[in-house]
């Protein structure tokens, strides 16, 4: 799945798929799915054995990778691999699973087994040189830096995250990002208590053309 987006594009990203305004570009409407086992060797993401090294994914700028650092408040065990290419990093009561997608992106799943009535996770982004982030609600766009003769282009995007409890309830999520590109995912609700909670979000590279 590839996207060709003009410099004035505003992408709308939801957990059910990706849509780009028809006047600017188009994308397949289907939801991104995990990469089949036969294709995992060709994925472009780099999933390290140790999570603290950062998960590196491609952007629409050739050769430029975005680094995604999982929360570092507690040590994570080395990656456990599945045949389909998933990597899971575990802490005492939390699991982080990274699943390769067919468009070269990754789907991130955070499972907290015994949460209280709130949680707070910080995901740090290492942006490649010559790029910056732009927020649209709970969607985060990665764009190239613009210049008078070189307009800014969309080169990657994070879909809006979603929180679901083990009882099937959807919980409102607060998303904040600071000047250092640290994204904080937090929620507070009595429905979070005494039930497993799953937070899911995805990253997608965008092959932009002028």
Model-derived features: where do they sit?
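Secretory targeting and sorting signals
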Residues: 1-28
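Residues that cap or anchor secondary-structure elements
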Residues: 27-210
């Amino acid at each position: 799945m590839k996207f060709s987006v003009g410099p004035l594009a505003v992408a709308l990203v939801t957990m059910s798929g990706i849509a780009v305004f028809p006047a600017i570009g188009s994308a397949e409407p289907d939801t991104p799915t995990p990469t089949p086992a036969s294709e995992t060797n060709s994925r472009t993401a780099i999933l390290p054995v140790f999570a603290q090294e950062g998960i590196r994914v491609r952007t629409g700028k050739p050769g430029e990778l975005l680094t995604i650092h999982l929360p570092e408040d507690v040590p994570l065990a080395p990656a456990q691999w599945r045949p389909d290419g998933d990597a899971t990093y575990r802490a005492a009561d939390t699991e982080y699973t990274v699943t390769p997608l067919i468009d070269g992106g990754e789907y991130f799943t955070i499972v907290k087994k015994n949460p209280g009535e709130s949680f707070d996770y910080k995901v740090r982004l290492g942006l490649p040189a010559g790029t910056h982030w732009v927020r649209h609600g709970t969607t985060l766009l990665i764009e190239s830096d613009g210049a008078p003769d070189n307009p800014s282009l969309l080169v990657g995007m994070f879909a809006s995250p979603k929180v679901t409890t083990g009882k099937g309830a959807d919980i409102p999520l607060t998303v904040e990002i600071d000047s250092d590109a640290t994204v904080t995912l937090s929620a507070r609700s009595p429905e979070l208590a005494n039930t497993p909670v799953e937070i899911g979000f995805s990253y997608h590279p965008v092959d932009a053309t002028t």
